[in-house]
Amino acid sequence: NLYQFKNMIHCTVPSRPWWHFADYGCYCGRGGKGTAVDDLDRCCQVHDNCYGEAEKLGCWPYLTLYKYECSQGKLTCSGGNNKCEAAVCNCDLVAANCFAGAPYIDANYNVNLKERCQ
């Protein structure tokens, strides 16, 4: 769920508050359209699409609780997760790892969605 996703982000990017990723570019945050502004925004676009695929399986990605571990910045989804838990956990894990590898460009925080994301 979103709370667990926030904690995963803190695991892989402890130096930056999670809310910096909640309003970034065209895809980090609620909804998303247009062309991603950079690599970090593309991480969010992929995450949005991953949640969409989980929904097609009948899952509720924003609410699904799953089991995972964070150890020294490394995330692992539990093998004991059911189909939906595993799908959502993997979406969040891939995104959190992607965030860790993408540069954060301050100018792309809180962009004007109407101007930049058509």
UniProtKB/Swiss-Prot annotation:
Entry comment describing in which tissues the protein is expressed: Expressed by the venom gland.
Which Gene3D superfamilies does the entry mention?
Answer: Phospholipase A2 domain
The record's GO molecular-function terms, alphabetically, read:
calcium ion binding; calcium-dependent phospholipase A2 activity; phospholipid binding; toxin activity
| Keyword Ribosomal protein tagged | no
Residues reported in the UniProt entry to bind Ca(2+):
Y27, G29, G31, D48
The reaction(s) annotated as catalysed by this protein in its Swiss-Prot or TrEMBL entry are: a 1,2-diacyl-sn-glycero-3-phosphocholine + H2O = a 1-acyl-sn-glycero-3-phosphocholine + a fatty acid + H(+)
SUPFAM superfamilies in alphabetical order: Phospholipase A2, PLA2
Location in the cell reads: Secreted
Active-site residue numbers? H47, D92
CDD domains in the cross-refs = PLA2c (cd00125)
Recorded hits in SMART domains, A to Z, give: PA2c
Q: Which GO terms describe its biological process?
A: arachidonate secretion; lipid catabolic process; phospholipid metabolic process
Q: List the disulfide bonds.
A: C11-C70, C26-C117, C28-C44, C43-C98, C50-C91, C59-C84, C77-C89
Enzyme class of the recorded protein, top EC level: hydrolase
Query: What is the protein name given in its UniProt record?
Result: Acidic phospholipase A2 CM-I
Species whose genome carries this gene: Naja mossambica
